[in-house]
Amino acid sequence: MLQVEHLTKIFKSGDQEIIAINDLSFSVPVGQFLTIAGRSGSGKSTLLYQLGLLDIPTSGKVLIDDVDMVPVSENERTAVRLNDLGYIFQDYAILPSLTALENTVLPLLMQGYTIAQAEAKAKKALEKVGLLDRINNLPSQLSGGQQQRVAIARAIGHDPKVIFADEPTANL
């Protein structure tokens, strides 16, 4: 389960403080979806960065399976990010010199999978997003929507407990 308690994120710019997230609390049970909607600049991406442990909130808790991730060490947060979380970023930035398969395999290798394991998981993920027939294509040979699906395959390849998606269908 993902649980957020009194989450606040304040950015400082000189003498000014910009409150991006103010005392937010909610929980998302296992197997459930949560959609966050709001206008541009309302803090949606900032919230995802806090939830995904890519940034530290000013105050509050982010609990994954009842463990508060805010006070743990950066090494522990990195391990959770690599093993338990999947990310689909608004600007997905797949690597232009790698094929769809290689782009999907790379994060799995970083997580410690063998090449054979990583390729099998990557092919399964690419099949789920309908790109098994394009695994040898470079990003320049894929449409924007297909590139977005490679990013989705990367996010789901290791069967994460939680997936964070920032406008995941923007290019589809």
Question: Where are the regions that the model predicts?
Answer:
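ABC family nucleotide-binding domain
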Residues: 1-172
